[in-house]
Amino acid sequence: MIFSRIMRGLLCLCLVLTVFELINGSDEFEHQDSLHLVKRLWRNWEEDQQKDREKRLWRNWEEEEQKDREKRLWRNWEEEEQKEKRNLPELKYEMEKNQEVPQLKRKRGILEKIWIPNEIGR
């Protein structure tokens, strides 16, 4: 951005000098040099502008791609959360069904704590 302003300033300066030389009646050789300089500066300025546009477009494209990736990841995460919430009651029932509960059992006069599968739903 700063470079393009500098180039614009130089271009304007060259144009002013070219006009000034034409008004003062400078010889044709100097006029041709100035004209070539102005053309070269103009061409360089246009190329720089094109490069800046391409960089800006590329950066914008990359930012959009990053946003799309983040949206996709977020959407996938939300979908997984919804699936887990839908499956939660079913999982809870399965856990209760298969849960082992401690019970006391008398064995030769000694109380032992043993784990017996829960008989809910059987």
Swiss-Prot record:
<feature type="repeat" description="RLWRNWE 3">
    <location>
        <begin position="72"/>
        <end position="78"/>
    </location>
</feature>
<keyword id="KW-0732">Signal</keyword>
<keyword id="KW-0964">Secreted</keyword>
<comment type="similarity">
    <text>Belongs to the scoloptoxin-08 family.</text>
</comment>
<dbReference type="GO" id="GO:0005576">
    <property type="term" value="C:extracellular region"/>
</dbReference>
<feature type="propeptide">
    <location>
        <begin position="26"/>
        <end position="86"/>
    </location>
</feature>
<feature type="repeat" description="RLWRNWE 1">
    <location>
        <begin position="40"/>
        <end position="46"/>
    </location>
</feature>
<protein>
    <recommendedName>
        <fullName>U-scoloptoxin-Sa5a</fullName>
    </recommendedName>
</protein>
<dbReference type="GO" id="GO:0090729">
    <property type="term" value="F:toxin activity"/>
</dbReference>
<feature type="signal peptide">
    <location>
        <begin position="1"/>
        <end position="25"/>
    </location>
</feature>
<feature type="repeat" description="RLWRNWE 2">
    <location>
        <begin position="56"/>
        <end position="62"/>
    </location>
</feature>
<keyword id="KW-0800">Toxin</keyword>
<keyword id="KW-0677">Repeat</keyword>
<feature type="propeptide">
    <location>
        <begin position="105"/>
        <end position="122"/>
    </location>
</feature>
<keyword id="KW-0165">Cleavage on pair of basic residues</keyword>
